[in-house]
Amino acid sequence: MRKIILLTLITFCFSNTHAQDDIRSSSEKRAGFIDFYWSEKEGKIYLDIEKINEEFLYVNYLSAGVGSNDIGLDRGQIGNQRIVKFIRSGPKLLLIQPNYDFVAKSDNNEEIRSVEEAFAQSVLWGFYIEDERNGKLLIDLTDFLLSDVHGISQTLKQSGQGNYHIDPSRSAMYLPRTKNFKDNTDFESILTFTGTPEGGYIRSVTPTPEAVTVRVHHSFIRLPDDQYKPRKFDPRSGYYAMSYQDYASPIETSLTKRFIYRHRLEKKNPHASLSEPVKPIIYYVDKGAPEPVKSALIEGARWWNQAFEKAGYKNAFQVDVLPDSVDPLDINYNVIQWVHRSTRGWSYGSWIADPRTGEIIKGHVSLGSLRIRQDYLIATGLLQPFKNDSIPPEMLEMALARLRQLSAHEVGHTLGLYHNFAASADGRASVMDYPHPYIQLDINGEIDLSDAYDTGIGEWDEFTIKYGYSDFGPNQNEAHELKQIIDDWIEKGYHFITDSDARPKGGAHPLAHLWDNGKDPASELNRLIKVRKVVLDNFSMYAISRGEPISNIEEVLAPMYFMHRYQVEAAAKLIGGVDYAYKVRGDNLPLPKVISRDAQKAAIKSLTQTLNPEFLSIPKDLLKLLSPKAPGYWRTRESFKSKTGATFDPVTAAETSAEMTFSMIFNAQRMERVIQQHLTDKNQIGWSDILEPLYEATWESNYPDGLGKEIKMAVEKRLFFHLLDLSINDASSEAVKAMANREVENLISKITDKKANDSIIEAHYNHVIRLYSQFLSSPYDFKISQPLSPPDGSPIGMDCMN
């Protein structure tokens, strides 16, 4: 019996060894950073690990995406970036992610260990060791590579598209992009997610929406050496910050350490005022971008070399076309990728960085291909070009000018830079703002696009590159030099305000806006109102080409009719506004200051113009052209919404526009600031300074004839509904609720006393009174009417940093 058992064990061991020999001998070996074997017969990847406990960077990407902007699973999308290592426990290897958010930078090993053991780590996967020989451990990596590391199922679920799960029978390795290099080992897999589609987005982009097939790329990357020197973060510098908690910090210093994200760049000659770099920063443009797009992307990205020259470098920033042999996801290449979606959407400037230091290893830009078509559409609406067979060249030039700036903007993010949404107030001082085309009227009163978009890097951009990339000589004090750079831009009067202060509808900063122009938002709104009138008065069938359905005019009209929408947001922020900066103690930036009464009243006056029936009405001759959709065409998210079925609805268009103004004015945070500012200083505006001009433009003005009458009534109801909403909204302070209740009571009292000789006006008054009665009986159950949404606005041609 003992002999049988011994023979069985010998046979098993021999078979197991032979099996592993078969894996190595019968599989294709690919040597590189971490050697691996591809078994064609099994369809498996085996990783041959020589160094356990050695950290490396693990990144996943979506190499082939879904194609829906709303879902967000785009080609080239970067997933999680993690420092990981393999550790052994008996017959298993664990892929573990240490916790670099909490560390101890210390020579005391016990102090380091105490922090490591205080906070959780993450084991990403466990592998059984298939074979051990010559100091190498063989593991089967396949299941890991075919797992949902990118969180695709979760994204589909969160976007309302249904519950999807990986189907292993329809998933496999993708060999054309599974490669090995000296410093990175890359794998790619085909993943098929099966489920029942619940949303329209996934149906619109997938041939069989029950099976969504994408490709995921995995990169194991050698960590950079220790020669990179992190640069201190300053909130005024314009850079994104990386941070961690250092528990070995002296008690008198901050626990949190902050550094900027930036590429490694050094001068060959640090003593020279202008020197070539040791290694330039090179970006490569996707060959999939067609001409003239590709040339525009290259030209715009190359603008950054101007800023690097100001920082003391010669040819430090270069842009070329991506070679055929290079994978755009290869960690060794900074890439500007051309990404297609079914609808226009955001572009992204992302990076892969060393989580320990903030050193950017790879910049990766994703540019939405439909952006240029949106700018071309805007130019079409402005110029009405199809009267003759020849197309004005300024249309394409405007679109390409925007694309150059977009390329520069997104590359700026990958250099580590924040948005600067105050730059437009400083004479378009940065490509890191969101630019609205600057549309002018020439001396003949005709549209002039000659200065629609700026060219080149701005002055603010030069300051930021100096801060992030200057290589200071041995006789220079870095802290002093960095302070001097910031003091310089402060002295020159530039402004820096970023996303957290510019994006919220309740934002208070007078200069931090998206898609605006000029130093004074109210004055620019007045100017844009005049431009809009010229555009609408001249709008005709020449907005579409000969042979195109006349019903397509609607989509060209939409961005013209709502041309003012972003400047309305900018002007509204003056109400209850506060001018402030990211000041630190000891600098010359100003302390916060409430916007003057005159500036706030000017904003209210400008905004009130956008509520007049004359402003909101579409010219009669143009209205005659707006036709129901032709067969084979249909309304899209770029179209006006309608309450009249197939026909164009000018009243709903007007109501939608008015809602843009009211929703900004009656923001609960804004109205509370108005109360506080007025209580602090009686010279500041109060609620009456806002409501009286609005009443004069609506309930207290005469009703025009024709459609203007119903437009005015629709606007009046929006005002009424906003007051109701403020009175019960959880976001409203108690003071705002009280003031809103007071205003709506006074309004109802005035309406009750009004007499109307017109049946529709009388019905309008009675309806509002009846609605208020219903509201009083059950305010929190009362359903406040919501207007139909406008056609898509943002992005005109911009991004969202990941």
Specify the residue positions occupied by each region the protein language model found.
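Conserved catalytic/binding loops enriched for acidic/polar residues
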Residues: 426-802
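Soluble non-cytosolic domains of exported or imported proteins
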Residues: 77, 287, 291-299, 397-406, ...
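The catalytic-center signature of Zn2+-dependent metalloproteases
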Residues: 321-340, 401-457
